[in-house]
Amino acid sequence: MTPGRLLAVSDLHVSHPRNRRWVADLPPGSPGDWLLVAGDLAEKVEDIEWTLRTLRSCYGTVVWVPGNHDLWAHPRDPVKLRGEARYQHLVALCRDLGVITP
């Protein structure tokens, strides 16, 4: 295993253009890097997926714990899932992307 770093972020809120650019401009890390993401990526599933995919491409291991903004069903989100169904959808998305989540 490549030695790496343990990094942590939260509240990325990528629906804000400045925050989205910050995530898009992250430099690649090493395969041994772990990133802990403590919630509030976005309010729409497509933005959550983009963020997790982008972070996963930069870090060897990504661990994500959803926050209230991630789990809240925004009225303009085309994915109209609420509650447990939304959570399970996000868990399945993480599994597909290779992101660790509870």
Task: Give residue ranges: language-model regions.
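N-terminal active-site segment of His-dependent metallophosphoesterases
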Residues: M1-W64, D70-P78
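Extended active-site neighborhood of metal-dependent phosphoesterases/phosphodiesterases
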Residues: V63-P102
